[in-house]
Amino acid sequence: MMSDVELVFKDESDCLVVIMGHVVTRLLSYRQLHHLTPESAGVLIGERRGQHLVVCDISEPGSGDIRQRCRVDRRGVHHQSRVNEAFERSAGTHLYLGEWHTHPEDRPFPSATDRHSWRRNIVSDESMLLLIVGRKDFWLGKKERELITVFKKIES
């Protein structure tokens, strides 16, 4: 998988999500390539451009987070601090867009635990992104109220 190349995803309603290249590089650095590597998690930060979303930044694992091989709990206060800083630096254009975490599988797919957690914890009138970083690929979904829809990666 190449790094520093942006990823573009599209859903059935032609909504586009662009993940900037430098963000892709950081996400790839957390892949669970070794059998002892724990899951990682953070938040997605970026811009809403009409129905389209651009992921410009992320928060990364840190103090307070609980990380195990097949479980992660994003508890660190630094995640919200990162969103607040991005919002201030961008004069209000960079916002919380959703969540990301890793899975120890090549082609990730949401677990029942993932879906339950998203339904319980992500409550918003805005659509929120749900990204899973696998060893060889990504899974991207969007939660709108109770509905989760899946994006397809556009190959470049």
Swiss-Prot record:
According to the UniProt entry, how is activity regulated? Answer: Cleavage of conjugated proteins is inhibited by EDTA.
Residue ranges for motif JAMM motif? 101-114
| Keyword Transport attached | no
The entry's keywords: Antiviral defense, Hydrolase, Metal-binding, Metalloprotease, Protease, Zinc
Q: Does the keyword ATP-binding apply?
A: no
Q: What happens when the gene is disrupted?
A: Not essential for CBASS function; when the operon missing this gene is introduced in E.coli it still protects against phages T2, T4, T5 and T6. Another paper shows the operon confers protection against phages P1, T2, T5 and T6 but not T4 or lambda.
InterPro entries named in the record:
CAP3, JAB_dom_prok
The cofactors named for this UniProt entry are: Zn(2+)
This protein's source sits in the domain of life called Bacteria
Induction comment from the UniProt entry of this chain? Part of a CBASS operon consisting of capV-dncV-cap2-cap3.
Described purpose of this protein according to its UniProt entry: Metalloprotease priming reversal component of a CBASS system. CBASS (cyclic oligonucleotide-based antiphage signaling system) provides immunity against bacteriophages. The CD-NTase protein (DncV) synthesizes cyclic nucleotides in response to infection; these serve as specific second messenger signals. The signals activate a diverse range of effectors, leading to bacterial cell death and thus abortive phage infection. A type II-A(GA) CBASS system. Reverses the primed state of DncV, the CD-NTase. Cleaves a DncV-GFP (green fluorescent protein) fusion protein precisely at the C-terminus of DncV. Overexpression decreases the efficacy of CBASS protection against phages T2, T4, T5 and T6, blocks formation of DncV-conjugates in vivo, and inhibits in vivo activation of DncV. Antagonism of phage defense upon overexpression is CBASS-system specific, Cap3 from this bacteria only antagonizes its cognate CBASS system and not that of C.freundii, E.coli or E.hormaechei.
Regarding protein family, the annotation reads: Belongs to the peptidase M67B family. Cap3 isopeptidase subfamily.
This chain's protein is named CD-NTase/cGAS isopeptidase
Gene name for this UniProt entry: cap3
